[in-house]
Structures are given as structure tokens and as C-alpha cells.
Amino acid sequence: MKYIVAIIQPDRLEEVLDRLTEKEIHLVTVTNVLGRGRQKGISEVYRSHKEAGSLLRKLKIEIAVNDDYVKQAMEAIVQGARTGKIGDGKIFVLDLHDVLRIRTGETGKNAIG
């Protein structure tokens, strides 16, 4: 089992969710986050004064998948999130040691679905 964490642009969420649904991946958690990468934040002009913000709004998508779905999940995220511009995001894949579905007590692969 793997735990996939993706950081994407907020305006790409619906596209990513559509691509995940096409691949039969439905269990997703989405969180608003702040962060920066190589683009190092943004600069805005407010009342003739240039203000630099070091953190940008992003979305964090978290998905627990069985090993058979890792490649499909990553492909779906890339297809939905990629614009070809700096700031498209990152995908991290982590080992997932165990899962417990609270309602039923199921563990492991059965708890993911």
C-alpha cells in the first residue's frame, strides 16, 4: 500500500479529480495549504507599493491506494495538474504500513477499497 501526497495549483483541482475518477480512484482528501517551490513566491503591487509574498496558495491531495493503483493515480494527477508552467506541483509516494477503517474494523488493503 502507498500514500500519495500531491501539491497542485488550486485551479487544477477539478481536472485532477476528473482524471482520478476516470481511473476508478475515488477516496481523496484535499486540504488548502501554503507553500513555495522554485518560483519563490509572488510579488504584487498594492497602492503603488511592491509587496512580496513568500508563500503561495496550493492544494494538497492525499490518497491511500493499493500497490496496483499507484501508477494510475500518479498518471491521473499529472494529466490533471500539468500546465507546463513553473508551479505545477509535486507528487510524493510514501510507504503505507497499515490502514484501519474505523466503522468496520477492516485493516490493510481491505480498508482502502
Residue ranges and their predicted role:
Residues 1-113:
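Positively charged, small/polar-rich N-terminal and surface patches that mediate targeting and assembly
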